[in-house]
Amino acid sequence: DDVESRGLGDVYKRQANELLEQHHLIYLNSNLYAYQNGVYRPFGKDQINAYISKHYPFAKIRFRQEVAEQVKGAAYIDQVEETSLINVKNGLLEIGENGTVKLHPHSPDIISFRQFNANYDPLASCPVLDQALDNAFSGSSEQIELFNQIMGYLLMNHTRYQKCFFWVGLPSSAKSTFSTMVRRFCGEENVSSIELDDLGKRFGAAGIVNKTLNIVPDIKKTKLFASGLFKALVGGDAVRIEQKYREAFDYVFTGKMIFGMNLFPDFSADFEGIERRLVILKFERVYKPTDPDFNPGIDDDLSTNEAMSALLNRAISGYKSLIQNKGFLETQKSKQQMAAFVSENDSVVAWVESLDDAGILEREPISGPDGLYKAYETRCNSAGEKAKDQKDFTRIIKTRYGYETARKRINGKQYPMFIKN
């Protein structure tokens, strides 16, 4: 029996080694991946079984299971080293600190799970793409540059800038057209489409593992009661990923998130830290079928190989711009949209913005029965919102509007007051 077991063990190992050599397999986070056309892709039980069936058509279930276990053990890796190389269809791009771009051949030694659906061609251009951007952003060069930076951030295998993107515009403002183009650019297999409020559900975040992008062209109006996971994903913090019928694991998401919308989502229940993690891109143009330049085939025109290569060149330009500027451009349109978003989501800001006379902040005490906090609390109650506590109320007004606090005597009593810096 021992001889037979040893013999079978050798067969299992031989089969496992053949699989490993033929497919360059790795086993990470309870998942197998095989190297194909320059990138590691999921390699499941069905593919192992198909291989065994071809070479051992009469193999029993135990044989298949043992080979699978041998493969997992031999292919196991603990983690993947971060690389700054960008995986595209015709090689691996390296963007140097001085802005030079080099194209290296693909290699199974560079473990990469995502490949952009574009060939690098530094001379590639696409007039249809140029015109579409010009139309969508009303010819604003800074808005187009911000779009390029967002594309450049997609190329980065990290989340150091800690930003998520809201694409805001009325219906028929090309948000879906651009979303379709960006999905194709990233590669459909590298994109998820999980709604904001679904991310926090038990298995919701499992769908973003190894994705370049999570994009939803038009999110439903939703209220988020907890934003901790959202902030962790955007900020590159480790999150616990639960998978159905598999072991949970800690994961750092290096992909990016884009959400298209007509109306802002409601973060008011947990708004702390949201504003600094957002970049808002405003889509200006509303398209009508009667417009002289209306193009019903725009999605196809923006999905050609030329369009993808031209978009890659824009992304490379945006990549360099991000590094040079040490962050994203703050355009005038983005600032306006951010102010509207904050006003909708921060009850303290909304209350201050609603005041007919902002000077009242310096004339009235913060606390007390007729104080500013009481007026704010009353407004929240009438709107059916939960008021922030007085400490947070005071801190927000101080940091956002440039006030300090000091105690003053009013009618014989000491009260805290806001004073200008």
Regions found by a protein language model. Give the residues of each.
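Single conserved hydrophobic/aromatic residue that forms the stacking wall/gate
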Residues: 1-12
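P-loop NTPase catalytic core of nucleic-acid-dependent motor ATPases
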Residues: 21-46, 92-210, 279-281, 312-315, ...
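Positively charged interface segments
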Residues: 29, 61, 65, 72, ...
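Long, basic/Gly/Ser/Thr-rich N-terminal segments
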Residues: 35, 42-100
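Alpha-helical scaffold elements adjacent to nucleotide-binding pockets in ATP/GTP-utilizing enzyme cores
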Residues: 51, 181, 211, 225-233, ...
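Conserved nucleotide-sensing/catalytic segment adjacent to the nucleotide-binding pocket
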Residues: 204-246
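Loop/turn-to-beta-strand initiation segments
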Residues: 210-213, 253-257
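Phosphate-handling catalytic cores of nucleic-acid transaction enzymes
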Residues: 305-347
